[in-house]
Amino acid sequence: SVAWIAVNAPVAMKYPDAWREFFRLNQERGAEWTTIYSVLSRNTGMSFSPEFLNTFSLVAFLALCAAIAVLGLRSARTPRMAELVYLIVAAFLLVNKVWSPQYSLWLVVPAALALPRWRLVFSWALVDALVWPLLMWHMLGTDNKGIPHELLDVAVISRDALIIAMAVFIIRQMCGKVTDKVRDAHGSSDPLAGAFA
């Protein structure tokens, strides 16, 4: 936090409007094209105001974090750090109103460390990598031979479903329903726990 303040405080004091712009934009914008809210909107005609999305996404994220905390405290074994990080980041991405392409990178390392099931992780990564080009192709519009929204929606739903599938595997792993290969390979300890092990 000291580094964050050291970098941000001078900029915020000298250029307060510019410094607040990201926060202003994020508060006022609607759902980004590759979120579940946009998929629902395109397919049902429902519209979501920025105020609703801000409130709903925050409440949903906090509720999911509380559920993850309860799960972590009550699981059959102490969860590994990577498992908890994956679940929290996945929860944020799935309920957030914005999903910029770089946000998916936040899941790569936790997914690789929490779930050594490479086929599932690579399947998600491949589908996720397709979302951006499909979005660009869709944004061309039908007059310019852009793809219909249904193809983009299938990619978005597939990406989200694979993220949820990985979360389910991780939860099953935490509850002792499936073998945790990482824990087994490290003498039943969490290699990321350090002094907290």
Model-derived regions, located:
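Central hydrophobic cores of alpha-helical transmembrane segments
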Residues: 1, 83-89, 109, 120-131
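Hydrophobic alpha-helical membrane-interfacial segments at the cytosolic entry of transmembrane helices
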Residues: 1-11
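Extracytoplasmic catalytic-loop and juxtamembrane helix elements of membrane-embedded
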Residues: 11-42
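Alpha-helical transmembrane segments of polytopic membrane proteins
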Residues: 26-30, 53-60, 150-163
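Aromatic/glycine/proline-enriched transmembrane-helix motif characteristic
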Residues: 30, 34-94, 171-197
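Hydrophobic/aromatic-rich transmembrane helices and adjacent perimembrane loops
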Residues: 100-117, 129
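Aromatic-enriched
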Residues: 121-197
